[in-house]
């Protein structure tokens, strides 16, 4: 199935992309027009008005809600995403709230987990979009995460 072209960039199966959260969200919804998806997001899924049937939504929150994943439980985040990648031949993953994962664990732990996911995704036809807010990270963290993943920015972003 065709992969959407977003901001002049062609997404490729088996790759992980780093995008600002707003761009990641809009790109994810374009993908889910033709693919199944999983989204780990900061917004409570029950408040989303335009939910898609093809998407499983998980809430990155310490809430006891059945659809919540605690930001300190990086193993559960990894497990949900790697299980999705194994179970779906063509799919898309959206992971938002990197700063919440870092606060719940550590930057080193999050980077290690994202690197493992990148390796797993590279063997599939999955596309993974990581939404992040560059302003919420220390410069050294931002430099490290931006060196690990292909970055997609809008022309007006720095």
Predicted region positions:
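Substrate-engagement module of ASCE P-loop NTPases
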Residues: 111-136
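Well-ordered, non-membrane alpha-helical segments in soluble/globular domains
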Residues: 74-79, 108-115
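A short helix-turn-beta junction within AAA+ P-loop NTPase domains corresponding to the substrate/partner-engaging
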Residues: 141-158
């Amino acid at each position: 199935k065709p992969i959407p072209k977003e901001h002049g960039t062609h997404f490729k199966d088996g790759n992980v992309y780093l995008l600002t959260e707003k761009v990641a969200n809009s790109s994810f919804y374009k993908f889910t027009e033709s693919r199944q998806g999983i989204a780990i997001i900061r917004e409570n899924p029950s408040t989303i008005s335009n939910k898609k049937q093809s998407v499983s939504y998980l809430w990155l929150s310490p809430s006891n809600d059945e659809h919540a994943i605690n930001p300190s439980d990086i193993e559960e985040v990894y497990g949900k995403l790697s299980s999705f990648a194994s179970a779906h031949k063509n799919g898309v993953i959206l992971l938002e709230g990197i700063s919440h994962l870092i606060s719940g664990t550590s930057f080193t732990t999050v980077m290690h987990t994202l690197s493992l996911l990148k390796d797993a995704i590279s063997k599939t036809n999955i596309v993974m979009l990581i939404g992040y807010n560059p302003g919420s990270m220390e410069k050294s963290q931002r430099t490290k995460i931006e060196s690990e993943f292909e970055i997609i920015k809008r022309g007006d972003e720095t």
